[in-house]
Amino acid sequence: MREKELIVYRDFEDGELLYDMAFLMSHYDDEYYNTEDMAALFYECIHDLIDLAGNYGFHGNLWHCYLANLLVNNENSYSCGCEILGEIAGSINDAALHDICIFKEFYDFDFAPMMEILKVPEFSLIENYASSMQESKVYNKRICARICELAEKFCADGTAEDMKSTLTQFYKEYGVGKFGLHKSFRITHDEEGVHIVPILNIAHVKLDDLVGYELPKKKLVDNTEAFVNGKKANNCLLFGDAGTGKSSSIKAIANEYYDRGLRIIEVYKHQFQDLNTVISQIKNRNYKFIIYMDDLSFEEFEIEYKYLKAVIEGGLEKKPENVLIYATSNRRHLIRENYSDKEETREDMHTSDTVQEKLSLVYRFGVTIYFGAPNKKEFQNIVKTLAERYHVEMPEEELLLEANKWELSHGGLSGRSAQQFIDYLLGK
């Protein structure tokens, strides 16, 4: 096998299995090696494939799924160039085709002679593997299904050129690596630096699930539509009362625009100093990124807002056109302002400058969207809509009476308290 001749596709995650299998394919009938040792290595490879199936949720031909997964996750000059955009021009295509030819050889390898010589009939276990249907540790069911489907498509490809075309189409439709497969991400920081890691399971909420708030939702959609279409768009601040659907709206945006190349990266306040590093990792990718900050607010002694202002303003370097910042907050003005800020007896001689600095952060958001608490009539409409959606059977008069009792002791009139009331009824 020619695994050492790979040019573009290298440095695979979980790549050790590939090299072990390549060694077996090349030397299983070599008299120089002990047959029992080779069989032991083969069993170890079978174990690794089944272990990967458990972690990733693969089913069917596990060897084919493994190879497809390597190709889908390998970020290189060819795959990153093709993500979202499709086929690219240049000599890189020849280098990529060279590598796909090698993968085609791996894909079409006939294991029957190896199984006979090494006396390993158990290989049939991984040719038609049935998964436990449990949620995998690495992929959700949507991602797992796409990779297994890609593995099946490769089986129908007669040539390496066909296989390359199928793979390139996958890159165009979904992308490559973690950004291609996942919708949402968070930031981790360790001794090796800042990492953007996938959020495996997010709520499958849609904007239509949020009852009412048609004007705020339209304003949010219009700005996001412009962004994913490559037009000018603004950083966006969603503010207003607690429980009114601000965070749910952001989650809905992540779900509804994923197929059009939108990705969400959640950043917490203590991570603002890492924002420049995060942006440097995503600015040259062919996706649109929203950096999302939930429940954003600052006390008077906190200075993290200065990192955020610096990032939004961009400094000398032009802000990437594929990055926006969306934030939610219960405050219209994000930084707490005290009366003492306006007292002339303060040590700061330029009092107005101090006040303006604290107020200026909100002005960095070109679009501000207000989510107000519903009135009694709107709250009751939310309750009735949710009750119908979840098939709650209760006379309307009794339903609304109980809902009114519920909101009095559970945070007042809001979409959240309405949903909690319906959840309470469903759990009885």
Q: Language-model segments: what does each one mean?
A:
Residues 1-209:
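AAA+ P-loop ATPase mechanoenzymes
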Residues 199-225:
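N-terminal pre-Walker A segment at the start of P-loop NTPase domains
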Residues 299-349, 353:
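Conserved catalytic/switch belt of AAA+ P-loop NTPases
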Residues 346-359, 366-380:
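Conserved AAA+ ATPase "SRH/arginine-finger" region at the nucleotide-binding site
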Residues 235-265, 277-284:
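Walker A/P-loop
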Residues 368, 372-428:
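C-terminal alpha-helical "lid" subdomain
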Residues 263-265, 276-320:
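Conserved nucleotide-sensing/catalytic segment adjacent to the nucleotide-binding pocket
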Residues 271-273, 296-299, 325, 329-335, ...:
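Conserved nucleotide-binding/hydrolysis micro-motifs of P-loop NTPases
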